[in-house]
């Protein structure tokens, strides 16, 4: 079979053959037209099929791209949230790490509010857990470092200060008359005579004795 060098040469050859066939065989031109029409339909169907295939391929690629972007954004949000959580927990460690300083301040002062702050911080430290293994190690070290540092002495001094505070509050309530105490009248001195009253009675007694002596001498 001969091959044509180009489409134009092929078209020219087909046109020449068609003319010869028209002259030699009547009706051949109609058959050629049908063949051409059929070929055109086949070509159009192929073009449509190719277009549909391209669209489907584009749609699949677009879905893959959207899925990738969604997963990537989700991963970024998780990393950002994890970073914020880590930062927050590190800040919390920094806040709780000053418990030792507060304990020293508490030993040097009798501030009940400071004791309450220390108690809250220790409670928060004891109840703190995390899924981060590195942070968990730091937290455990912080617990041991703070809770095992002269805690017995700290508790003893705190108990002593609590007793002093309770005693001072009790005395204040007695002086106000809010609490009755054996031997005491609310708001007054103990039952009996005060030192001033004793002195006054002694002075009065001395006066009576002197008057009796003067009466005796006058008689």
Swiss-Prot record:
InterPro entries given for it?
A: Rrt14 (IPR031404)
Q: Which residues cross the membrane?
A: none
Q: Where is the composition biased (Acidic residues)?
A: 194-219
A single Pfam family it belongs to is: RRT14
Its GO CC terms are: nucleolus
Composition bias of kind Basic and acidic residues appears in 153-176
Stretches for region Disordered: 153-219
Q: Which domain of life is it from?
A: Eukaryota
Location(s) in or outside the cell: Nucleus, Nucleolus
Q: What is its main location?
A: nucleus
Q: Which keywords label this protein?
A: Nucleus, Transcription, Transcription regulation
User: Does the record's keyword annotation contain Cell inner membrane?
Assistant: no
Task: State the disulfide connectivity.
Answer: none
Q: Does the keyword Nucleus apply?
A: yes
Q: Which family does it belong to?
A: Belongs to the RRT14 family.
User: What the protein does?
Assistant: Involved in ribosome biogenesis, probably through modulation of rDNA transcription.
Q: What name goes with this protein?
A: Regulator of rDNA transcription 14
State the organism named in the record: Komagataella phaffii (strain GS115 / ATCC 20864)
